[in-house]
Design a protein with these regions (language model features):
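Unchanged
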Residues: 1-228
Length: 228
């Protein structure tokens, strides 16, 4: 995947810069890497952070394309990745003073000659790059707070986004995990179209959402949207 731009969001400029510093080995030279702090000191959600990141990306790409004002033209063929990083690590982290995005994983880079450990943020970039390798121009939003482990043979099929505007990534989980997270509910029985996401639903609410093998499609921190 050749990303046009990658925007890293964080509560502060310093935190965003630190996460960006772990990413160069996962990028192509042509990728524009942007550190985007939250627009306010108040706590903001991922939706507001995404909008702020998209504005920053649009401004940067417009300027690089020679526009003196904000223009959507540079986005038409752009593939943009937004990475959300939180303020601090979750409980149990081996690095409690660091954002979760900077947590080192027990693995090394896959680039020949590379020996440095991979951070959660870099893992998110590499996973998104492989998973959405054939996507058309559009937007991918990923969290760096969870470790998404997907078989190397799994990837988004190009024809999927020709039929729908976007898609979410969900993985099968047990009921014990599902009741603590968001479970994808289909628009209709047997449909692959997303109707809603049931967040921290009761066992009774989730009873009808179980797959034939008894697992539940739990939403992970990755969303893809086609076109601009």
């Amino acid at each position: 995947m050749r990303w046009t731009a990658i925007a890293v969001t964080a509560p502060t400029q310093e935190a965003a810069n630190e996460v960006c510093s772990t990413l160069p080995s996962a990028l192509q030279e042509s990728t524009v890497l942007l550190a985007v702090p939250d627009a306010t000191s108040l706590k903001v959600g991922s939706g507001a952070a995404t909008l702020n990141a998209l504005l920053t990306v649009a401004e940067e790409l417009s300027a690089r394309a020679g526009f003196s004002t904000l223009s959507a033209e540079p986005l038409r063929d752009a593939r943009v990745l937004v990475l959300h990083s939180g303020a601090s690590a979750r409980g149990g982290s081996p690095n409690p003073c660091l954002p979760q995005a900077l947590t080192s994983l027990p693995t090394v880079g896959t680039v020949p000659g590379e020996t440095e450990a991979v951070s959660m943020a870099e893992w998110a970039v590499r996973t998104a790059s492989r998973l959405f390798d054939d996507m058309p121009p559009g937007l991918v939003v990923c969290s760096t707070d969870s470790l998404l482990l997907i078989p190397s043979t799994v990837a988004l099929q190009p024809d999927v986004l020709r039929e729908v505007a976007g898609a979410v990534v969900a993985v099968p989980q047990s009921l014990e995990v599902a009741v603590e997270h968001g479970v994808c509910a289909p628009a209709a029985a047997g449909s692959d179209l997303l109707g809603s996401i049931v967040y921290r639903g009761s066992r009774e609410q989730l009873a009808t959402l179980a797959s034939p093998d008894g697992t539940y499609p739990v939403r992970q921190g990755a969303v893809v949207a086609r076109g601009w």
